[in-house]
Amino acid sequence: MAGLMLHLLMAHKIKPKGGILFYIGSIAPDAVANWKDKDITHFRNLTDRSEALENLALQTSPSDDFAEGVLLHLYMDWRWDTLARDEFIKKIDGDWFIKYRKELSLSNSYAFHNTDWAKNLWEQMELLDSSEYGKTPGATVEELKDLICRNNKWHNDNNMEPSTYFTPEFIEKFINQVGDEYTQWKIQREIEYYNSLPVDFVDFIDFEKLSDGEIELFCVAKKPAIPEKKWVPAYDFEIRKNNNRAGRINLRIGYTDGLYYGGHIGYSVDEQHRGHGYAEKACRLLTPIIKAHGMKKVLITNNHTNIASKRTCEKLGAKLIRIAPIPEWHDLYKDGQRFENIFEWSVD
């Protein structure tokens, strides 16, 4: 194991604005008290830990902050054991464990007292009611709460010099290397997760009226799938106000690698009609169509600098999964975009 503060450094690298449950999840697996049980919950008893982690990732909803933190913890410990612990053992004569634990204590204490957000984060974690915790394999909520309280006190009470082996430079390099590696690994697992979700498309559906009394969606095109281009079926609507066009919105039916970045819903509101929340309202009017096609979760993506579109997603209650780098094979990359906000909107 790497130590709780180092796990929090990794969590901050992955999601600097992540919710408090994500951070708690990122240390939760160490609430397992028995070392033999901890080896099992950390997959150390398995020949292939990577396969177990992949299987867990495919069962983990990207919108579940706590579970996402747990997954990150287990992935980081797997890489730490290989890149840090095992290398340490090779260089130590005799009993390595006590020396290893000492160096970990030094590095974790130093990180706590030399990271500007650490003290406040630990206080927030301790203050959160344990009833909000997610599930920690092998540990109770009481054990997790105790872990947080004990270690918050320990970090505050112990201000140590940096480790001479796990130096701040070593830790920074490890966090950056494994953090970037994890992000690419996790994005691929998220794509596989969404691609496994149910969808029901036999044909396009006609709806008599899609209106909330203020705006109306008028279907202008139903675009069949183009399998050779990996394009899914799509609806194209005009957003109308008093029978006059106010914008456009489209809905794509299905899940593909490309739609992870491109999203299921795209919208634009004509300039003279902006500022009235029409994009959000139009998205909500699509709900019966989304449900009719058996989809419970849709992705809405936007350029990471597009504040207005991001605000629309937030008003919908969509969950920001991550800011994802766009791969070179995607059309968005060819259009000059490099990062997309990936939002998940649950329509249950």
Q: Can you name each region flagged by the protein language model?
A:
Residues 1-197:
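N-terminal leader/auxiliary helical segments
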Residues 238, 250, 264, 268, ...:
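Conserved beta-strand segments that form the floor/walls of ligand-binding pockets within enzyme
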Residues 301, 319-335:
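Conserved catalytic-core motifs of GNAT/GCN5-like acyltransferases
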Residues 205-260:
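Acetyl-CoA-dependent GNAT
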Residues 234-236, 337-344:
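Short hydrophobic/aromatic beta-strand or adjacent loop that forms the aromatic wall/cage
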Residues 305-322:
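Conserved active-site alpha-helix within GNAT-family acetyltransferase domains
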Residues 267-269, 275-292, 311-315:
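Conserved acetyl-CoA-binding loop-helix of GNAT-fold acetyltransferases
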Residues 290-301:
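Conserved GNAT acetyl-CoA-binding A-motif
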